[in-house]
Amino acid sequence: MPGLLRDYFVVLPDSVAGHTVAGQLPAPGTTGAASDPTATGPAFAPTATGTSTGTGIEAGTGTSTGTGISTGTGASTRPDPGASTGASTSTGTSTGDVVTVPHPSGRPWVLARPLFRKVSHLRRGGDALVLIGPGRVPEAVLAGLLEGARDRAGLERRLARLPGLHHVIARISGETWIRGTASGLRRIYHARHPQAGTIASDRPAVLAHLTGAPLDDGALALRLLDFLPHPLSRRALWRGVHETGAGYGLALPVAAPGTAAAPGPHEYRWWEPPPPELPLAEGARRVGEAIAASVRAHVGGLDRISCELSGGLDSTTLTFAARATAPAELSLLTVAARDRYSEDETWARRAVEAARGGPTETPAPAHHIIPADQAPYFYADLTATSAELNDEPLPVAPGRARAHLLLSRARATGSRYHLTGYGGDELFLGLPHAYQDLFHGNPLTAWNHLSGLRHQLGWPLLPTLKALLDRSAFPQWLAGAVTTEPQPVTRTPLLSWGVRQSLRPWFTDHANALITAEFRAAAAEQAEPIDRWRGRHVDIDAVRMGARHFQAMEDIGMTIGLPVAAPFYDDRVLEATLAVRLEERISPWRYKPLLVEAMRGVVPDALLARTTKDHMSSDEHQGLREHAHELADLWTGSRLADHGLVDARHLLRLAAEPFSPVLVEHSISSTVAGETWLRTAEDAWPTLQPTPTATTVTTTSEALK
């Protein structure tokens, strides 16, 4: 079952049935997945005490090794100077690369297979805390978090001291709760097992495997869109599997005395965006500190690391932040562009030159440039996606071969962790919708900024005023967020709750009906926005969408054997960014002003002066021509067509006409991603039968329970 055996954790109830479910989890033998990510082995079978059998026990460490392979000594292969094991010496064992944290009864509570992430845990009496993140959390820190917390709110206040990168699983006063991150980088799913009741995981595919859940055609149809807005982005791909919203946690009450089953789970909100009150100088200081802390949390103490250095401001920022951690060896990787007008490589070379001219005690970074003719076009090697089963189809899938090349080259340098600048655009560019928020409190400043943006984008005056004064509610916008009409022209003002999308001409009537019904159902149920202010709603939704997409990079890294990180998706970075006054955080006259000020003194001023950004649209269009035969093969025997969602004949015609005006107006990347994902998912469940005639639509309230 590709994709299921690499990286996951499961939270189980304290019952005989929960113990039985533990024995059904897919797990490898003692061979590390980094060397063979699709290898299968015997299922993990805990003993009656909840500890695993066999050899290679990591007694009391509660952490996996840096390679995902148990050493049998309890030692991590990742250097962690001065850190303790971060676990109670009385609980937590592992066999192979499976870590078990038991209930007080001894039955398994948390079962985790973290290839690169660390499981840190502590138990004090009946209370317990488990953190799953990029590095080991010392026992003293865990004790300070757990022992001072009397309830959920108290624990959350203490957790805010850590980088916002962890899955949190806690038990206090008999209640268990689980949460991911506010950025959406770490997510939580749950499902009801027929015997064990509610089980939770960070991987929906694992829950689908355990419960026998079939694919949901309505959720699959939604993923054919380029952007899936809140709250529909929470629709899991399997029926009966539910996602807990980012910023929300999942509480799992225990069974009442004398009863056999616990009440059902309920969601609670643990995170609120901070008010935008800080001036630029103070906000920049906090952003810089949060970025530095996140980078240290990922790569601090490692001897050899790598960074993608595109030449843009985001990757340049992380290059210098990583350099500040003083690794023995820092490798910087740049993919040369085919476009002769591209400026990225020039700026990347300038960044390397500046980095090499730093303090003499810091080793000079190595720069590896991948020639443009070695970089695959988009849509190359589409069948290779079967190596990873992502949580959902992701539009970045057509660029997998390019990402795989870059990460493979990074691993070949000996890197033990790779950093990317993903998330920088979503956080620091700023979207026009934000001026709706500013208009309420400071209309003159808002109009001044918006006028500058309007002239840059060519927005007509009257439509801009109309959009600015529009006060439609979120459900009203959601009901009309998809249409069969042509794509909006580029000069259409964007100041609403999101982007209106056109249904693709190759979608079937069945797919269009499913998609439209999903949006209308969410609107009819009065779906609430992420934030009452449009700009903040759109900004946070964009960050969470980007965090979802980044999962594809993480999974490719797992396949290769190299952990990949995007420090910008740290909750502390998100919070520091949102806390800055809107009129200072974004500007039509400055490029990413908050990030620029945050990096002063870290990144040389000459590099902070860049105001341009390259794009790879030409590589995508050329990829349609270069890989026309692969695309034709993809649509021959299309699984999406079997589900009644796309017209395979229409797609075959487009494969033969790569420069068709249809493909200029409508991107095909999400459809390609859906097709390749579906093939991988059906390989994982070979008995799965398509249901192209199904007309039922799961309403949002049902899907989000």
Where are these regions (language model features)?
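Acidic, carboxylate-rich catalytic segments that either coordinate divalent cations
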Residues: 637-705
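Charge-dense polyanion-binding interfaces
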Residues: 211-212, 218, 226, 587-611
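PAPS-dependent sulfotransferase catalytic core
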Residues: 432, 602-665
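Alpha/beta-hydrolase fold catalytic core
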Residues: 520-553, 560
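Short, hydrophobic/amphipathic alpha-helical patches that form generic packing surfaces
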Residues: 221-229, 405-408, 540-555, 666-684
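Structural motif
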Residues: 153, 213-219, 528-541, 588-590, ...
